[in-house]
Amino acid sequence: MNEDSRLSSSQQPSTSTPRSSIPSTMNSDEPNTCRRLSQSQEQPSTSRTCKSETPEFGYSDSLPFAPWRRKRYGLNIQGLHEEIVDMYHWIKPNEIESRLRTKVFEKVRDSVLRRWKQKTIKISMFGSLRTNLFLPTSDIDVLVECDDWVGTPGDWLAETARGLEADNIAESVMVYGGAFVPIVKMVDRDTRLSIDISFNTVQGVRAASYIAKVKEEFPLIEPLVLLLKQFLHYRNLNQTFTGGLSSYGLVLLLVNFFQLYALNMRSRTIYDRGVNLGHLLLRFLELYSLEFNFEEMGISPGQCCYIPKSASGARYGHKQAQPGNLALEDPLLTANDVGRSTYNFSSIANAFGQAFQILLVAVTLRERKGKNHVAMRAYKGSLLHLIMPFTSKELTYRNWLMSGVLSMPGQEAPASYDLNQLHNTLVSPMVDLSRYAWLRKAPAKAEKRDSRPLTIVNPADDRQTLAQQLKKQILEQTEAKKSLEKMPACDDNKKEEELVATRETDVELEAEDTESEGHHNGENDLILTGPPLPTSTQSVNTSATVSTAASISEREDTDSPGLSSSMGNQSSEEDEDNGINNRNNSAVPVQFKKPFNEVVAQPARESKRTQTTSEDKMQDQFHFNGYSYPPPSRYAAGTAAPSHKHRNAHPQRQRPSIRNLSQGSDGSDEYNVESWNNNIRQGRRASSNSPSPSRQQTNTRNCGPTNNIPYDSFRSQNKNSTLDGSNNSSEEPITMYADVVKKKSSITTSTNTSTADVNVTNGNPIPANGIIPQSMAVVNVGRGSYRNALTTSPMTPPSAHTSMQKQHHLRKDNECGFDNNSATSSTDLSHHQPQLVPPVNRLQR
């Protein structure tokens, strides 16, 4: 049924009938056909009759039957409430739909203003768009107000319709001049939305303001209005020109319901405790389908009461309402009957009754006796789907409308970007593409053939140019220097000034280069510094001894390089091991260590202070009969009363069979004969592994072996030293290896003690009176150490040297590979030079 047929039949009360219910061809039996036609006209449009419609081409039922469903709702009143809440959140207008309709309204407003530019008119929107209670398929209501209209209302409508067609913004335009409220109905070309344009109907704007106040007083009206509007729209009972109920009339019915039957729900929201929208919906359907007598009674929402139709007609001076019509008084204007066009309210009441029965049976199905397996199997998880399903056409249209709308201008019309909008998701804000219209416009110089693309600058090129500039400056400086050299001698002062200036510029350029390099490294996040290099275990004591005990005068006498305290620099031994790395890292290799024989052979002032390994110790010893013994040391008195702080702070590690010669640690008690390590040379007691308490006490034993040197001569050599190793004089005691080497050069063959006075048992000289002083006495004779064994056991002949080497419990003092046979015949240290032994003999030992 088209719009013309609907307008022609608007004078007679009739129900809106689906197209499929009317047969297209008449059978031979005309009475039966007329009877079926009359029955179909009397019956209201229900969900069953609407489902029988054949779907249009291009649409199918593949979309979900209840798109708002989030779960399987229970068959009870609480499940109905939860489903209504979910449907409200799904169907309510979002920001995209609101702004889209606002854009369409602005387009229509501009067109009407251009058409009536000679008159002062006012254009505004009202209805569901202003109250934000519109459905995805709702139309847009536009009001045109003007005080100096000339002619009949039909002329205004026709002129407005011609202007809309001329602007090419309407797909179709229809004029309804014979209606109670004359309107121009058009369909937008871009969005397919319907627009109703009315003239001088101020009541619509007032009604929109009234609905906004009602929503503030009864917030629960909003979800029920949207649900019932979709319910009526599904049955084609929402258009007034076909006898349906308008949106304003539906709001007044809900206001009357809340005022009389649910007044306690004022200012309550859907999430408040005690609110159940399912109960309110069932009560509303029951009231207006079974209890309200619309044929004899009218409704007055302003007075909160029911009024008989006869009284209403006589009271306001109007004729009585029609028996089948709805009498609904406007609270803003009591003389206005909002339901005067709702002549098909009987069909609306029947639809309310059917929905009430369906929902009532569904929510009470589990409470009934017996098992309704058929009903349970038919239930798909949604109750509202039984009374108001959404068609695939409506869902497809809504998704298309929110996905994106682009206006394509005609051939003659200029390019306009007023309606260009982009929507990505349902919650994304509106994006007006008019702000990006300049991207589509070609630049003025784009058509020229000699246009060149933009140059891409590489940062590397900038660095190259900077390097070239620096080279030019350097060349200029060199030329300036050459010119200064050619100047006469009389201008020496000027020449010096210019040289100073050039030097200053060189320094500035170097500073700039370093800053640029640092800036470049900072940009690339490159860290050029690293952690300190590890120090090998063989140079720990050596570096520590040299760095802590050496004085400034000693460092000046030696030719060793400067040492670093905490920067992690490599020691002399590591430099020798990593000679290849040193050659690669530095342009000019620096030799940090010399061979041992060169150090001993060279003068004392040129000796290396850092050479303090086991080789130094072997040099300080003298050899007798194949065994190495400590020389008559001048440090015995200094080590007579050592301190145990070093031992307590750094306990000795247990190493049963391996001795680290560079660190001076003893492996066992049998190795105590060689306790002259670097700690002794610093005036401290050497560490030991013996658990004996006598070894932990002070002033009970000597740190070194017993030396039978006359006490007087010993006092004469160390007259400035005290027993604790301190020096009372201003001159510091000599504790470094370099000084020991110096002393070696001054030793002569004429000594205080001769070889005849040497004790054959321990190799120490015997005093003249035959009395050994207490400081030189042997301690712990009963201990099984190698030193005590030498003092107590008889002298071993040279022939037994080979057998003594097989005793593994004795100390191997020849681990460095020196030939001791050359030292057995003489004890003169001044002419003693160590000789290296081949590796084969070294392995055998």
Curated annotation (Swiss-Prot):
UniProt keyword terms in alphabetical order: ATP-binding, Cytoplasm, Developmental protein, Magnesium, Manganese, Meiosis, Metal-binding, mRNA processing, Nucleotide-binding, Transferase
Disruption phenotype: High embryonic lethality. Hermaphrodite animals are partially fertile and those that produce sperm and oocytes have reduced brood sizes and display smaller germlines. Hermaphrodite gld-4 and gld-2 double mutants are fully sterile and display either an earlier meiotic arrest than gld-2 single mutant or a failure to commit to meiotic progression and a return to mitosis.
Keyword Metal-binding set for record: yes
GO MF entries: ATP binding; metal ion binding; poly(A) RNA polymerase activity
Biased composition (Basic and acidic residues): 482-506, 605-620
Known EC number: 2.7.7.19
EC class of the enzyme, as a word: transferase
GO cellular component, one term: perinuclear region of cytoplasm
Tissues and organs where the protein is expressed, per its UniProt entry: Germline-specific.
Entry keyword Nucleotide-binding: yes
Biased composition (Low complexity): 7-25, 535-551
All residue ranges annotated as the PAP-associated domain in the record: 276-335
Domain notes: In contrast to other poly(A) RNA polymerases, lacks any RNA-binding domain.
Additional remarks: The gld-4 locus produces a single transcript that is SL-1 trans-spliced.
Name listed for the protein in its UniProt record: Poly(A) RNA polymerase gld-4
